[in-house]
Regions:
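Positively charged, Gly/Ser-enriched RNA/tRNA-binding surfaces
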Residues: 2-3, 25-41, 51-52, 78, ...
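Short acidic, glycine/serine/threonine-rich loops at helix termini
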Residues: 56-59, 120-123, 178-183
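Short, glycine/charge-rich beta-strand/loop segments that flank catalytic centers
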Residues: 47-56, 106-117, 166-176, 196
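Hydrophobic mid-domain F-helix/FG-region of cytochrome P450s
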Residues: 153-157, 174-182
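Short, well-structured alpha-helical patches and their helix-loop capping segments
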Residues: 83, 103, 107, 125-127, ...
Length: 284
């Protein structure tokens, strides 16, 4: 007689059950978040859990040998489909599909789970919820960004934080791209450089972690190695010096290339607009 198999009551690595008080609190916070999204004029959007893999894009992964390694993908006939990695890729696909039916300025919010095939860690899960608010279309960038900062401020206050408990850091990608162009960093290395800079404020990184990723490689506490951009010493120094600058006037003097200056001007316009909103004391 075949032995009866016993059920192993466990979860896959990187996933968790959410229940009781923790789930009740989550639902309360989501209600505040959604109410603010609606107050700021956004319409809800739900997209399927799966997208066609080629629409997700190989830019998501850092491993050139296996560019889709950070996502969960499956074969569906002659196509590959991927579990939703974020809420931005589905939005881009939706707008491209429905562009003719959308208003010239389209505000949408989405609150859905996303899935990452990444190494789990403390507080780092393979399935988690994102809440996105986006403004798409013909609008003034400074006003749109100020509106988003006011939305963030109002939402966090309604969720129970006070103004002393959070700040909103802003930047402009044109400033970074201008520096990258100025340093003659090759195109195949640029994405790694941008990803390294984006990790500056991430716990456990700081300037030391960014420096390692700008060089040959970074080894984390577990011993896992991430391949770096392999820049030369002067390029690394210039980027680290740039990251230490906190004053917009100093930045304007240091980066004289046209693209960076354009990004700095957009930031200046933003700070003029934000002075009239609820977020003026929260933004830096």
């Amino acid at each position: 007689m075949e032995k009866e198999k016993k059920l192993n009551p466990s979860l896959p690595s990187g996933f968790e059950d959410r229940w009781d008080k923790k789930l009740v609190l989550k639902k309360q916070l989501l209600k505040e978040i959604e109410n603010n999204f609606i107050k700021f004029g956004a319409e809800p959007l739900e997209t399927p859990s799966f997208e066609i893999s080629e629409n997700i894009g190989s830019f998501l992964a850092e491993d050139e040998a296996n560019p889709m390694s950070d996502v969960f993908s499956f074969k569906d006939g002659d196509k590959s489909i991927t579990l939703r990695y974020d809420l931005s890729s589905p939005l881009a696909r939706f707008v491209a599909q429905n562009n003719q039916e959308l208003p010239s300025v389209y505000k949408r919010y989405a609150i859905q789970n996303v899935f990452r095939n990444e190494k789990p860690g403390n507080g780092r899960y393979r399935e988690f919820m994102q809440a996105d608010f986006d403004i798409i279309g013909n609008t003034n960038p400074a006003q749109a960004n100020a509106e988003l900062c006011n939305l963030i401020t109002n939402t966090l206050l309604d969720c129970g934080l006070n103004k002393e408990q959070f700040t909103i850091n802003v930047s402009n990608r044109k400033i970074v791209q201008g520096l990258i162009n100025e340093l003659n960093i090759s195109e195949e290395k640029q994405l790694k450089v941008i990803r390294a800079i984006d990790k500056l404020d991430k716990p456990g990184f700081g300037l030391t972690g960014v420096e390692a990723l700008l060089k040959k490689e970074r080894k984390d506490a577990s011993g896992a190695v991430t391949k770096g951009a392999d820049l030369n010493d002067d390029q690394v120094k210039q980027i680290l010096d740039f990251l230490k600058i906190k004053d917009l006037k100093e930045l304007k003097q240091k980066l004289t290339n046209e693209l960076s200056q354009e990004g700095i001007k957009e930031l200046e316009d933003f700070f003029e607009v934000i002075n009239f909103g609820n977020a003026k004391d929260q933004v830096q």
